[in-house]
């Protein structure tokens, strides 16, 4: 199974990055060691399934959930009260943690970035977030957001540390093609790739009841993002 996984990764990388397959194959079985060490940090948020970016020596954490993955029987699956509505900045060197509420942002942006299992990719000073599963108030339901949000990473980090308003550092656009959750997004040479994932609308039911619809993408989307209008616009 391990070799199949590695070969699958090699194939995907060879598609996305021409010329990488040979060098990857030469090194994928080289011996290596991996050490994981826990570092205690006061104030570190207990969240999962969030998007993140890095600027200089600080981390930016957006979205995700504050509860574990349990209690999935409707109407208790994915309670909205456990969506992470704070945005965090972490300095791993000093151990400092800052946060600010996302509730002051416009509704469209706020609801999108507080979803979970979004796809995200950082390009220079901007973090791009697509899709994600969460509560949408206009339709009064849990769904996969057909949206893309651009985040000005250094400006947001500075605003959170200084406890200043976040307005003006986020821009959100609606695009049905971005209605994906649980996939992966990368950017290579100014082209973004949205890999796999699915669209899940409704409340989860472990018995496959009628409370949701689900469609797997089974695809890799490639596109560029045009920011010239002030909004992130997708061109495929």
Predicted regions and their residues:
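Bacterial Sec-dependent N-terminal signal peptides
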Residues: 1-31
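Beta-propeller blade signature
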Residues: 76-95, 142-159, 207-231
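Blade-loop segments of beta-propeller domains
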Residues: 77-124, 134
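Glycine-centered tight turns/hairpins at beta-strand boundaries that repeat
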Residues: 55-74, 129-139, 189-208
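Surface-exposed loop and turn segments in beta-propeller and other repeat-based domains
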Residues: 37-40, 94-111, 155-176, 233-236
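A short helix->beta-strand "capping" segment at the edge of beta-propeller domains
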Residues: 26-44
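Beta-strand-rich domains and repeat architectures in extracellular enzymes and scaffolds
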Residues: 38-72, 76-82
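Beta-propeller and closely related beta-sheet repeat lectin domains
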Residues: 48-52, 111-120, 181-185
């Amino acid at each position: 199974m391990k070799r199949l996984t590695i070969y699958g990764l090699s194939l995907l990388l060879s598609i996305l990055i021409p010329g990488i397959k040979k060098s990857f194959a030469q090194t994928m079985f080289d011996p290596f060691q991996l050490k994981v060490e826990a570092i205690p940090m006061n104030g570190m948020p207990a969240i999962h399934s969030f998007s993140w970016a890095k600027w200089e020596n600080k981390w930016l954490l957006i979205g995700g959930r504050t509860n574990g993955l349990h209690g999935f029987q409707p109407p208790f699956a994915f309670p909205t009260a456990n969506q992470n509505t704070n945005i965090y900045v972490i300095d791993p060197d000093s151990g400092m943690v800052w946060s600010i509420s996302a509730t002051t942002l416009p509704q469209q942006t706020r609801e999108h970035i507080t979803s979970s299992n979004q796809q995200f990719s950082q390009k220079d000073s901007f973090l791009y977030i697509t899709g994600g599963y969460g509560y949408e108030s206009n339709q009064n339901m849990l769904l996969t957001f057909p949206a893309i949000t651009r985040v000005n990473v250094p400006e947001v980090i500075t605003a959170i540390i200084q406890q200043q308003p976040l307005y003006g550092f986020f821009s959100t656009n609606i695009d049905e093609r971005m209605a994906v959750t649980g996939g992966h997004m990368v950017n290579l040479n100014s082209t973004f790739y949205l890999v796999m994932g699915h669209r899940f609308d409704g409340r989860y039911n472990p018995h496959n009841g009628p409370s949701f619809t689900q469609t797997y993408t089974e695809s890799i989307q490639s596109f560029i993002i045009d920011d010239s209008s002030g909004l992130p616009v997708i061109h495929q």
